[in-house]
């Protein structure tokens, strides 16, 4: 059987070692004779899973002790509402950086709760799509916080620069790039991320929030989205997505066993360099993102003749390269190469691309 490499943007590929262990433990976890999906979230066995998961995540990201780690429901879209309702307080505005599709989605949700100051940072660099450097972001004085998305999965645009905005509260949607590289958590007030790209299966959402920002929620905020309530209840205010939590915990251990975030950053750069080189080195393919803002996680590309898109997708699936269809908003192709994607998968893709170009160019 041809080895399958899954380039889906999310739910995305999980480490093979994690899946195999989950398969082995599925019906008899920890010698209990039952699945981890079937035990109480308040049992001592699952509480150990929860505690180890949090500690491993803290170790990986070097999360300071004055930050709470929350394991939540709802995905990033729930956080689009939770962030303003938890952080606005008595203020009526917040700075929202518009750098792409998902940043704009957060803005649309925020408009229900405040008057966002929208700062469009998209620009053209050598006729390619790019992002203005942070020093050019025109932040307002009265904003409750600054919100941005460091990696746009659809646009294939990344903001690698870390924020340095003095005492402003910075909120970042790290859904598609968390754990892919080292970051300084202390520069942020809130970091949130849906799990289904670089953490684990869909259904779990991580929130990392500085403790001094707790307890400021608006009265109308549903309790299940209140960071203070979730922190006070150790993310167990209601039954959490236990299986997704368990699998994510195994991914954290896998990351630590494979060298942590420094090693992931190195591997991800190597994979991205290989794929972008294959695109740039062949006139048959094109990526229109400026070099400084190219995503290491999500690589969109266009074929010279869009009439060949369907053939490319059919032949790629036959070659064991799945989920390469670009998002409906931009079309073309997209290869998502998160932590779990091995270098061998990217090599297989680039070899297929070269062969396809030879046959159809």
UniProtKB/Swiss-Prot annotation:
Keyword Electron transport recorded: no
Disulfide bond sites: none
EC class (word): transferase
Residues recorded with modification N6-(pyridoxal phosphate)lysine: 197
Swiss-Prot/TrEMBL GO biological process terms: L-serine biosynthetic process; pyridoxine biosynthetic process
Keywords for this protein: Amino-acid biosynthesis, Aminotransferase, Cytoplasm, Pyridoxal phosphate, Pyridoxine biosynthesis, Serine biosynthesis, Transferase
Cofactor(s) it depends on: pyridoxal 5'-phosphate
Residues given in the record as L-glutamate binding sites: 42
Keyword check for rRNA-binding: no
Superkingdom as given in the UniProt entry: Bacteria
MF terms in GO: O-phospho-L-serine:2-oxoglutarate aminotransferase activity; pyridoxal phosphate binding
Catalytic activity reported: O-phospho-L-serine + 2-oxoglutarate = 3-phosphooxypyruvate + L-glutamate; 4-(phosphooxy)-L-threonine + 2-oxoglutarate = (R)-3-hydroxy-2-oxo-4-phosphooxybutanoate + L-glutamate
Similarity remark: Belongs to the class-V pyridoxal-phosphate-dependent aminotransferase family. SerC subfamily.
Function field: Catalyzes the reversible conversion of 3-phosphohydroxypyruvate to phosphoserine and of 3-hydroxy-2-oxo-4-phosphonooxybutanoate to phosphohydroxythreonine.
The protein's name: Phosphoserine aminotransferase
Organism whose genome encodes this protein: Pectobacterium atrosepticum (strain SCRI 1043 / ATCC BAA-672)
């Amino acid at each position: 059987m041809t080895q399958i490499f899954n380039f889906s943007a999310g739910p995305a590929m999980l480490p093979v070692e994690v899946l195999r262990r989950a398969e082995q433990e599925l019906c008899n976890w920890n010698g209990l004779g039952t699945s981890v999906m079937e035990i109480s979230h308040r049992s001592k066995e699952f509480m150990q899973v929860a505690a180890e998961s949090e500690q491993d995540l803290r170790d990986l990201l070097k999360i300071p002790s004055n930050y709470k780690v929350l394991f939540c429901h709802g995905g990033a879209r729930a956080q689009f509402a939770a962030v303003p309702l938890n952080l606005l307080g008595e203020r009526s505005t917040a700075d929202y950086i518009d750098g792409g599709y998902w940043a704009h989605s957060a803005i649309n949700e925020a408009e229900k709760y405040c008057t966002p100051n929208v700062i469009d940072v998209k620009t053209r660099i050598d006729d390619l799509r790019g992002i203005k450097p942070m020093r050019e972001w025109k932040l307002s004085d009265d904003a409750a916080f600054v919100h941005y998305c460091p990696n746009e999965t659809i646009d294939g645009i990344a903001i690698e620069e870390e924020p340095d905005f003095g005492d402003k509260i910075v909120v970042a949607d790290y859904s598609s790039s968390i754990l892919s590289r080292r970051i300084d958590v202390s520069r942020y007030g809130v970091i949130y991320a849906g799990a289904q790209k670089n953490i684990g299966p869909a259904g779990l959402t991580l929130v990392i929030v500085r403790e001094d920002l707790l307890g400021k929620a608006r009265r109308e905020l549903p309790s299940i989205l209140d960071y203070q309530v979730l922190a006070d209840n150790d993310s167990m205010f209601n039954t959490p997505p236990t299986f997704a939590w368990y699998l994510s915990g195994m991914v954290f251990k896998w990351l630590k066993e494979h060298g942590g975030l420094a090693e992931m950053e190195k591997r991800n750069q190597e994979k991205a360099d290989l794929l972008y080189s294959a695109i740039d080195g062949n006139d048959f393919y094109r990526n229109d993102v400026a070099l400084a803002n190219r995503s290491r996680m999500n690589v969109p590309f266009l074929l010279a003749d869009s009439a060949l898109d369907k053939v490319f997708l059919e032949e790629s699936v036959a070659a064991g390269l799945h989920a390469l269809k670009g998002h409906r908003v931009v079309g073309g192709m997209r290869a998502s190469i998160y932590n779990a994607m091995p270098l061998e998968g990217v090599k297989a893709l680039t070899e297929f691309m070269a062969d396809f170009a030879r046959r159809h160019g």
